[in-house]
């Protein structure tokens, strides 16, 4: 009986402490040196995809240094209606941003796209099922590892070392642009291979 009780308690602790998705999709708590500041729900998303409606959720975090200077980091979680082809669609959109250099980076627990702006701003983005997660750094700083780790534990990256969705992930599939270039027929996102039925 003791062994059963111990196993039950261990299971409850293990699964009870797991990374379940927060009700408003972002972490509304302090993370590392950054203190949670505020939440905002947004309808004007950064990567609109035709035929795949989405809503955004953002959280701001603030850090004060010993000289009372403040730094602000941001996390943005966009939730799309479905995951099919999401990684390819987002990658196409990111490649079209002329003001950013894009690369793929090992973020520890998974791969992410790194966007670096001419003004020194840096962002890590990745796709996790039907969600796109974007974590931004204070100007001139690296993206805070604690924030990336916290969000990556909630939203594991679907990306591989080349910045494409790993085979078998829900966000895998060909983008609309790539299908057109390959001579494929124009299909709405909901009818593409891998779309939920």
Kindly give the residue locations of the regions a language model identified.
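Short Gly/Thr-rich strand-loop-strand
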Residues: 24-53, 83-123, 157-181
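Short, surface-exposed beta-strand/loop micro-motifs that present aromatic residues
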Residues: 56-67, 114-115, 120-127
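A short acidic-to-branched-hydrophobic micro-motif
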Residues: 58-88
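C-terminal motif of bacterial Sec signal peptides marking the signal peptidase cleavage site
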Residues: 14-16
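Short, well-ordered beta-strand elements
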Residues: 126, 130-138
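Sec-dependent signal peptide recognition
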Residues: 2-8
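Bacterial signal peptide processing site
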Residues: 18-21
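Surface-exposed amphipathic alpha-helical segments
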Residues: 137-197
């Amino acid at each position: 009986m003791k062994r059963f009780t111990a196993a039950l308690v261990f299971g409850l602790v293990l699964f009870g402490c797991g990374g379940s998705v927060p009700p408003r999709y972002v972490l509304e708590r302090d993370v590392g040196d950054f203190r949670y500041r505020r939440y905002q729900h947004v309808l004007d998303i950064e990567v609109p995809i035709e035929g795949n409606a989405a809503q955004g959720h953002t959280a701001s975090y603030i850090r004060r240094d010993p000289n009372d200077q403040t730094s602000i980091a941001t996390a943005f979680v966009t939730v799309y209606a479905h995951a099919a082809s999401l990684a390819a669609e987002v990658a196409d959109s990111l490649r079209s941003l002329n003001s950013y250099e894009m690369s793929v980076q090992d973020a520890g627990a998974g791969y992410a796209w790194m966007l670096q702006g001419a003004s020194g701003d840096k962002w890590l983005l990745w796709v996790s099922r039907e969600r796109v997660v974007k974590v931004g750094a204070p100007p001139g700083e690296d993206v805070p590892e604690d924030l990336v780790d916290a969000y990556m534990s909630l939203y594991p990256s679907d990306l591989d070392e080349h910045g494409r969705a790993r085979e078998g992930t829900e966000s895998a599939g060909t983008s609309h642009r790539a299908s057109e270039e390959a001579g494929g027929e124009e299909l709405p996102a909901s009818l593409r291979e891998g779309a939920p039925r």
